[in-house]
C-alpha cells in the first residue's frame, strides 16, 4: 500500500490506525506478562524440563490468544500517536501453524503485518482506501480506468459523485455543437444576406456516436455550414470537444483554406491597374471591364460580388437550375435559345475577346501582344542589357568597327562626322545615313525592333507566311515542280534539296535537280523567242541593241536600271528586252569585251 502523509489522510483512516495501535499496545503488555509468568512456572516446576518445544509454543500461543480476547480497553491517554508506532490490525485467531515462540519474546512485527494483509483481503465488509474516491464513495472499475486516463483537477468531480460514465452520447454532442454555433452567430453578423456558398468557409465538425463490435467511439463529420466566428476560438472549441480524434483529422485540407488574397491582374483582360475585388472569390476586375461598368468615384459601399458568385447564390443547387431549364424548353425553341444566352451572360464574368492560341500562333513570326494586338515576333530585337549600354546596342556615332575598319555610308561613302549619325543594318554589314535614305528618316528607329536597309527587296516582293508547325512531305516524283518564288534552300543536308512551302500548311521537300532543269528550260525558251524576234523585225532589234555600244567602252557591268530604261523607250518591245536581260545575266559576258551583236548573241546562247 502506498505511503501517504498523516495530515492528508481521512478521519476514518486515522481512526483505523489508532485502533490498530491500541491493539498492538495491548499485545505488548500481554507479552510482558506472559514472559514473567513463564519464568515463575519454570522455577516452581523444575522436574518438567522434558516438555517439548512444540507443546511449549502451543501453550504460549493459546495463553496469548486468551489474553488478547479477555483484555480490557485501556485509556486513550496511554496511546502513542507518533508515526513510528503505527501498525496494522491484528487478527484475534492467534499465530499460524508452525510458528514458535522463543523465551522472553512475543509475536514479531513482521508476522503481525502478514496477518494484517490476509485479514484485510478476506474480511467481509471492509473496503480498501484506494478503492474510494475523495468523498469516500466506491469507485467503479470503468471510472477508475477513466480517472487514470483523464485525471480531473480539484475535489468537486460531479461525474465521480454521480457514478456516471465518461462516454458522451450523440444528444450531448449535438447540444454542445448547437450551443457553440449560436454563440458564434451572435458574435458576428454576415455581410451578405443571400444564399452565397462561401468557398472560404471552414468546415464545422459534428460528432456522431458509432458502435462497432460493442465498442462505442466518437467520429467527427465535416459539414459545409457557414462558420462566421473567430477562427482561432473555433479551432480551440473543436479540439476541446473532439477528444477521441487525432489532431490530423481536425485540421482542414489545403483546398478548404480560405482565400487570403485576390488576383493582381484583371480577370477579364489580364491587364494591370486598379481593380474591384470580389468578396468570395479571388477574381478582380477593372472598373470599365465590369458589366455594367462602374465609375471609380461611385464605388459600392457594401460588399461587391461578381456575376458567378451571384448566380451561385441564387441557384445553389443544380436541381433548381435543371428544373428551370426544363420549364423553358417546354415553352418554345426560340425562347429556349434566348433564355440560355441570357442565363450564360448572367452566370459568367465578362472576358475580353482574343483570338484562340491555335490561330494566333499558326504562322511563324506572328503573335499577339498583352492587349491582344498584332505583333511580328521575328522583327523584335532581343537586347542584352549591361551597365554601360543600359539596354541600348545601337550607337549612331560609331566611326570604327570592332575589327578597326572605318564605318562609311553605303551611298555617300562618308563617315558619321558629316551628319553626326549613322545606322547599321540588322540583316547585313552596311551602314546608312538617315538623310541618304529614300525617304529620309526624321528620327532613328526603335532599339526594340530590327531595321532593314534598302539593299533588301523584302519591302517590294510579296511576303509569304510560313506555318509554324507545317507537315513535312517527302516527294517521291519530283518532276513537274516549277520555280514560283516561294522556295527555301536547305543547305544543312548532305544532298542539296529545296523546300517549297504552299498555303495548305504543308512543306514539300524536293531535290534541287528538278529546279535546275526548270531553269535551263526557261533559258531555251528565251533563246527561241529571241530568234523569232530577229526573224520578224531585224531592223528593230538593231536599233534597240545599238544603245548598248555606249557601255562597251566602259569597264563595268551592264546595270539593270539602264536596261529597264531602254525597255521603257519602246513599250512594244518590253518582252523582248526583258528576255535579252535574262540572257545577259546568265551568259559568260566579259565586261572588257564589247557587247555582242544580237545575231552573235543568239548564236552564242543557242544549243
From Swiss-Prot:
- Which InterPro entries is this protein grouped with? Chromatin_regulatory_protein, Zinc_finger_PHD-type_CS, Znf_FYVE_PHD, Znf_PHD, Znf_PHD-finger, Znf_RING/FYVE/PHD
Top-level taxon in the UniProt lineage = Eukaryota
Compositionally skewed regions (Polar residues) per UniProt? 35-50
Its signal peptide is none
Q: Which UniProt keywords apply?
A: Metal-binding, Repeat, Zinc, Zinc-finger
What GO molecular-function term can you cite, just one? molecular adaptor activity
In this chain, the stretch annotated as Disordered covers: 28-114, 142-188
Pfam name, any one = PHD
Q: Where are the zinc fingers (PHD-type)?
A: 263-312, 406-459
The answer, when asked if Zinc-finger is one of the entry's keywords, is yes
Recorded GO CC terms: mitotic spindle; nucleus; Rpd3S complex
Protein's name in the database:
Uncharacterized protein C2F7.07c
Amino acid at each position: 500500500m502506498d505511503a501517504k502523509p498523516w495530515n492528508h489522510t481521512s478521519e476514518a483512516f486515522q481512526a483505523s490506525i489508532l485502533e490498530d495501535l491500541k491493539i498492538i499496545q495491548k499485545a505488548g503488555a500481554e507479552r510482558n506478562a506472559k514472559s514473567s509468568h513463564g519464568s515463575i512456572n519454570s522455577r516452581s516446576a523444575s522436574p518438567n524440563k522434558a516438555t517439548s518445544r512444540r507443546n511449549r509454543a502451543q501453550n504460549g500461543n493459546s495463553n496469548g490468544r486468551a489474553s488478547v480476547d479477555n483484555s480490557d480497553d485501556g485509556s486513550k491517554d496511554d496511546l502513542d500517536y507518533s508515526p513510528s508506532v503505527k501498525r496494522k490490525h491484528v487478527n484475534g485467531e492467534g499465530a499460524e501453524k508452525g510458528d514458535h515462540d522463543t523465551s522472553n519474546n512475543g509475536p514479531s512485527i513482521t508476522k503481525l503485518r502478514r496477518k494484517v494483509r490476509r485479514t484485510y483481503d478476506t474480511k467481509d465488509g471492509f473496503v480498501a482506501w484506494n478503492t474510494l474516491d475523495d468523498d469516500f464513495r466506491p469507485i467503479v472499475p470503468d471510472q477508475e480506468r477513466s480517472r487514470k486516463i483523464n485525471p480531473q483537477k480539484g475535489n468537486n468531480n460531479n461525474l465521480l459523485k454521480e457514478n456516471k460514465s465518461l462516454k458522451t452520447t450523440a444528444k450531448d454532442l449535438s447540444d454542445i455543437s448547437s450551443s457553440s454555433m449560436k454563440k458564434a452567430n451572435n458574435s458576428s453578423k454576415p455581410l451578405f444576406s443571400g444564399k452565397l456558398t462561401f468557398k472560404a468557409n471552414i468546415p464545422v465538425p459534428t460528432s456522431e456516436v458509432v458502435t462497432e463490435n460493442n465498442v462505442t467511439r466518437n467520429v467527427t463529420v465535416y459539414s459545409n455550414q457557414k462558420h462566421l466566428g473567430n477562427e482561432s476560438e473555433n479551432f480551440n472549441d473543436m479540439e476541446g470537444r473532439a477528444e477521441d480524434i487525432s489532431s490530423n483529422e481536425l485540421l482542414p485540407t489545403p483546398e478548404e483554406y480560405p482565400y487570403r488574397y485576390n488576383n493582381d491582374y484583371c480577370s477579364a483582360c489580364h491587364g494591370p491597374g486598379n481593380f474591384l475585388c470580389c468578396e468570395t472569390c479571388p477574381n478582380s476586375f477593372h472598373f470599365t471591364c465590369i458589366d455594367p461598368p462602374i465609375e471609380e468615384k461611385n464605388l459600392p459601399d457594401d460588399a461587391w460580388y461578381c456575376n458567378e458568385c451571384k448566380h451561385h447564390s441564387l441557384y445553389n443547387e443544380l436541381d433548381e437550375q435543371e428544373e428551370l431549364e426544363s420549364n423553358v424548353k417546354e415553352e418554345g425553341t426560340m425562347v429556349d435559345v434566348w433564355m440560355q444566352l441570357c442565363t450564360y451572360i448572367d452566370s459568367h464574368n465578362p472576358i475580353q475577346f482574343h483570338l484562340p492560341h491555335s490561330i494566333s500562333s499558326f504562322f511563324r513570326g506572328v503573335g499577339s501582344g498583352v492587349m491582344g494586338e498584332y505583333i511580328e515576333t521575328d522583327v523584335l530585337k532581343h537586347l542584352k542589357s549591361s551597365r554601360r549600354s543600359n539596354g541600348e546596342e545601337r550607337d549612331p556615332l560609331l566611326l570604327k568597327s570592332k575589327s578597326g575598319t572605318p564605318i562609311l555610308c553605303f551611298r555617300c561613302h562618308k563617315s558619321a562626322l558629316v551628319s553626326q549619325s549613322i545606322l547599321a543594318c540588322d540583316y547585313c554589314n552596311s551602314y546608312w545615313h538617315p538623310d541618304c535614305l529614300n525617304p529620309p528618316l526624321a528620327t532613328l528607329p526603335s532599339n526594340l525592333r530590327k531595321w532593314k536597309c534598302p539593299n533588301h527587296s523584302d519591302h517590294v516582293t510579296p511576303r509569304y507566311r510560313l506555318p509554324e508547325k507545317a507537315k513535312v512531305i517527302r516527294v517521291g516524283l519530283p518532276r513537274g515542280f516549277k520555280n514560283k518564288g516561294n522556295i527555301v534552300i536547305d543547305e544543312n543536308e548532305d544532298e542539296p534539296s529545296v523546300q517549297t512551302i504552299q498555303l495548305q500548311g504543308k512543306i514539300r521537300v524536293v531535290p534541287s535537280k528538278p529546279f535546275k532543269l526548270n531553269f535551263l528550260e526557261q533559258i531555251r525558251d528565251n533563246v527561241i523567242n529571241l530568234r523569232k524576234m530577229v526573224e520578224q523585225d531585224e531592223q528593230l532589234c538593231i536599233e534597240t541593241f545599238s544603245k548598248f555600244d555606249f557601255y562597251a567602252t566602259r569597264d563595268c557591268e551592264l546595270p539593270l536600271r539602264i536596261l529597264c530604261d531602254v525597255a521603257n523607250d519602246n513599250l512594244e518591245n518590253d518582252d523582248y528586252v526583258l528576255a535579252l536581260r535574262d540572257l545577259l545575266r546568265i551568259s559568260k559576258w566579259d565586261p572588257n569585251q564589247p557587247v555582242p551583236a544580237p545575231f552573235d548573241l543568239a548564236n552564242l546562247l543557242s544549243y
